[in-house]
Amino acid sequence: MTSFLLFNPGSLQQQQQPHSFSKDFINNNNNNNNNCQSSFSTPLGGSNGINNPNATTNNTTTTTTTTTTTTNPLSGSTGINNSNIEVIDIDQCLKHCGCRNPKELIQLIRSDAIENVEISWPDDMGLWYMNTIKSHEVSLQNLVEGVRVAGQLLLLDPTSARFDLSKKQKTIVVRSVNIDRSSSSLSSEDDDCCYETEEDDNGEDGEVVRSPQSKFSLLLDESEKFRKSFSLKKSSRSAFKKNKKDYHHGSSAGGGGSSGGVVVLHYDNNGNQLHYSNSMTDNNSRHHQHGGVGDGYPHSPPAAGGKSLGKRGYQQWSNSNNNNNNNNNNNNNNNGASGFVQSDEDLDASWLEEIKRNRAEVVPDLSSPALFSMDKRSPSPTLGSSCGSSSPGLNNSGNEMNNSQDSPLGVSGGNGNSLNISSGIQCPPGANIDSAEKAILEGQIHLPPLLRPRQYHACKTSKENRPTKRRKNHTSLFCRHCGTTDTPEWRRGPDGRKSLCNACGLHYSKLVKRENMAVPELSRTFELSEILNPSD
């Protein structure tokens, strides 16, 4: 900010820029040409009056150049030093996981030890809501059937999973769809189409009941299969309704007019009859020209000929007419799965833009001691509502408590966007992540898996009280002679196998050998004595 002082011999004129100061006191002491340099402070940092005793003027025109030093309102109000500011690139913080189905996503969560899963979902108005849950609350069944978050059933899209490298804890950001709202709308349409009317040979109305789709059929590729099934279901339903409508029109108009046409009356919004058509080809040509019956006028019920439609037939005809425009618009917009994929890409792009807009791009450095003296009521930089749920009509106290436990920063949701410093020293996520931690999060440094913790017994018993280890061949045996139950080997005794211990068995075997050796000698001598001395 500079001010120009113009001096003429006859008069003194002062020209200032719009943001110049109100008072300038200039003292003329000598006639030398001196360029003075003074330091000023803005109204935020200093006073408005400026005293420059060294400023001099001359009879000729001189220019006084001033250098101003401004104080940043951010550092003046919050005490944050601007020299220690780290700028985080949001594009580098969101790294795509490359998951294609729920199975790969749950394997990634388990193998990489992901701690938090941040779920985002849009509402009917296009507003995005976010909530953070623990990874142990997510399972393969939840990914297939839906995760219950804040009273809503959310279907996660594994193809949109991204690593959030801006947070200290390992976090995955996933986009989801609220299937409670979509299932309710689909169920209302299914109620209309579940019971379709068919004329039997006898002329009576029949009902066709279709079984609901199994929940576990979406296991292979949930996101892609859900989009394709939804688009195919809408197109097949509209085609089926159109065929049924043409069939009922032709059958009801068979006795009333021409055999190949149908009488259709057209009315405007006030109920005045405009014109009528008596040809099926006219209806078909308008259908191909406008992408369906696109004239915008409500149709009257078909004229009753030789046979009426019946109560259920009239209800089905009215339901098909009510949903005709919606189905035709669906057929025009969704020419296969490409239209749905395009809308999904637009949804993904808007989701990423919402995340980038709600993230903090300027993070203060905690090494500055000025952050420790910040007051709770002092203004702070605005941060996005990436933590906590701002869903309307829901109690967010439990979610905010969980989020405050997960990360040291509590950020209010909705339009608040303020930094809540509750207790102690707290920092935004990603403020203390150094290069080593970033390398670990990005996968450049691989750490060994955690070792299993040692198992400690509740109470240790002495060796005397510990039970003795049983041998593999231990049985309930005891020695028949000494009564012992512990022996290195069991031996044969008079009562059979394994009836004596090792010591008693050896002693018994020696006795048996001695007896066997003594018996033949006695018998031999006895026989010789009998031979030599035969008895009478």
UniProtKB/Swiss-Prot annotation:
Region named Disordered: 1-77, 183-211, 237-258, 273-342, 370-423
Low complexity bias spans: 56-72, 318-335, 379-399
Compositional bias segments (type: Basic residues): 237-247
Pfam families assigned to the protein according to its UniProt record, in alphabetical order: GATA
Keyword tags: Metal-binding, Zinc, Zinc-finger
InterPro entries assigned: GATA_TF, Znf_GATA, Znf_NHR/GATA
Gene Ontology annotations of biological process type: regulation of transcription by RNA polymerase II
One example GO MF annotation: zinc ion binding
GO CC list: nucleus
Positions with biased composition (Polar residues): 1-20, 36-55, 273-283
Acidic residues: bias regions: 188-206
Protein name as catalogued: GATA zinc finger domain-containing protein 9
Organism annotation: Dictyostelium discoideum
Source taxonomy: Eukaryota, Amoebozoa, Evosea, Eumycetozoa, Dictyostelia
